[in-house]
């Protein structure tokens, strides 16, 4: 939970009081950056919950296809697995060429990782299984090249992506979108914030 992660950081950095902890958060940008990196959860995988992606491809993409330009926002994109998963399916549906995928996160460190389009090769077997279960049409390995222990995803996918920091709670929407995906972050918000 969020409370547990904050308490862990508070104890780890041995603050004598919450007031001192709060003071550092407010007055030291470098500590605020550390705080954000420590409390955000960035565990995700490609085609996580394959049935979701199957429905996205089968039921949502035909509606998106009616738009001249498709704008999709991946809010809380973490290290980018979900946005790359969506790009792959858009390409297979012949929709990527007219799409822009906006990938945002509060944590600039994970955004940098996401923008590289490089993932651990050890996860590709699981991602490939998820891809097939999600209704993927091709060999999953055609979307990346293996180099040492890394899978480097094709630049044709990331060329349709825009990466930026964004705080869902305090920042406004920056465009109009046909689809907003925030599956990685909604679980952390209370009911009032979700609305």
Regions found by a protein language model. Name each.
Residues 99-181, 185, 190:
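Extended basic-aromatic, gly/pro-enriched interface segments that bind polyanionic ligands
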Residues 42-46, 79, 170, 187-188:
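Short strand->helix junction
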Residues 191-195:
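Short alpha-helix of the ABC ATPase nucleotide-binding domain corresponding to the H-loop/switch region
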Residues 92-97:
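Short helix-capping segments at alpha-helix termini
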Residues 55-60, 83-91, 115:
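Short, well-ordered amphipathic alpha-helices
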Residues 1-73:
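Conserved AdoMet
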